[in-house]
Amino acid sequence: DIYPSWVAVAVIVAFLITLINVLGAKTAAVLQTVLTCIIGGAGILLIVASVINGDSSNLQGQMFVGESTGTMFQNIIKVAVVTPFFFIGFDVIPQAAEEINVPLKKIGKMMILSVVLAVVFYSCVSLAVGYVLNPSEILSSEAGTGLVTADAMAKAFGTAVMAKVIIVGGMCGIITSWNSFMIGGSRALYSMAESYMIPPMFAKLHPQHKTPINALFLIGALTMLAPFAGRGMMVWICDCLLYTSDAADDRISV
């Protein structure tokens, strides 16, 4: 399904993110910082409100789902199998390492710290949702809006307006991922061009901002064209790329 309004939104956002990255890594980093603060602020509001207005009895039956220890363990493993994909965006850090204004020895520590903080933050958000909504309310939310976290935020504050706040935070999360992959993808093309793995034209830097302009233009153009393919094609492409990138990582590791 292709909706002109959403295609227009996607094209405009893709253009703006491309432009921001052309203007320099510092400009893109400022955008990333601002949006991350919004995400953190929305999450902290939910966590604090859940502590004040939540009920610990709502967590009963939600912590470990299963009829026995064996089924509980199976359900934990099912979630554990997919959790590595939650951290796929962190691979952008080494790709942009040359432009990070910190000692190289600290980059590894920063990556580990960022992963730990992300685990703590999203674990607290998950607990906050379970602290505010009981199992039946969660099922009702999934069958209705599908925005369980937003519904938890609305209940915690007693107003539907706060649901919009958490939705804005979620949108910021999408944009930060989009922006980070733009940074990482363009730097990957730049490095490959410098190594003559792809045409050298992708190693060209902007005369003023020193950004890989041709690589950014290519990624930006493909990103702006992608929404016209529709959701079905996009899901298929993403699945294929995820599979092939994992296979490539395995080959490189070997």
Model-derived segments and spans:
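Transmembrane alpha-helical segments of multi-pass small-molecule transport proteins
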Residues: 1-25, 40-46, 215-221
